[in-house]
Regions:
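Active-site/binding-pocket entry motifs
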Residues: 1, 69-70
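Core dinuclear metal-dependent hydrolase active-site scaffold
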Residues: 1-57, 78, 141-144
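A sequence-composition feature that detects small, non-aromatic residues
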Residues: 3, 7-8, 13-18, 32, ...
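Active-site metal-binding loops of divalent metal-dependent hydrolases
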Residues: 47-48, 67-69, 103-104
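Binuclear metal-ion centers of metallo-dependent hydrolases, dominated by the metallo-beta-lactamase
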Residues: 56-58, 73-75, 83-144
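Active-site metal-binding motif and surrounding structural segment of the metallo-beta-lactamase
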Residues: 59-66
Length: 144
């Protein structure tokens, strides 16, 4: 992904150079976007996996986290339940609110993922982040 940084005619942004050392050049990468608006920030993580070196230090107001598939952390399969994985990711990111994506049977032949245990873990008193559900084609207020 970042193999051409050294050959770039202009000096790359420092953040891009820093990310070069924090991820694998061989696993296809993680699809994630941090959207920053005047009302707040939102991390959209489209894969059930992340690299600590990239996510560490991000503090999104809202996190949209994938719970589908086999999660991995730092390129290695996560050892534990999907609830354990989600709680570890939420502890690292410390978002104010969390919703889940890529858990439904969107494509025929692929089963959905039961998100109720993960949602319940965020709905207990004292949870580090609040859970909110999203429905198809239904607007959701993201920021309070």
């Amino acid at each position: 992904l970042f193999a051409g940084l050294d050959a770039a005619p202009d000096r790359p942004a420092p953040a891009l150079v820093a990310m070069n050392e924090k991820c694998s050049h061989h696993d296809g990468g993680q699809l994630a976007y941090l959207l920053i608006t005047s009302r707040g920030s939102m991390l959209i993580s489209g894969s059930a996996g992340y690299w600590r070196g990239i996510f560490d230090g991000l503090r999104p107001d809202v996190a949209l986290l994938s719970l589908g598939g086999r999660p991995n952390v730092d390129g290695e399969p996560f050892q534990g339940s999907s609830v354990d994985y989600m709680l570890e990711q939420v502890t690292l990111l410390r978002p104010g609110r969390v919703a889940f994506c890529h858990h439904d049977p969107l494509f025929p032949g692929l089963p959905g993922v039961d998100i109720e245990p993960a949602a319940a873990a965020l709905q207990v008193p004292g949870a580090s982040a609040g859970y909110f559900a999203m429905e198809y084609a239904t607007p959701v207020p993201l920021f309070g």
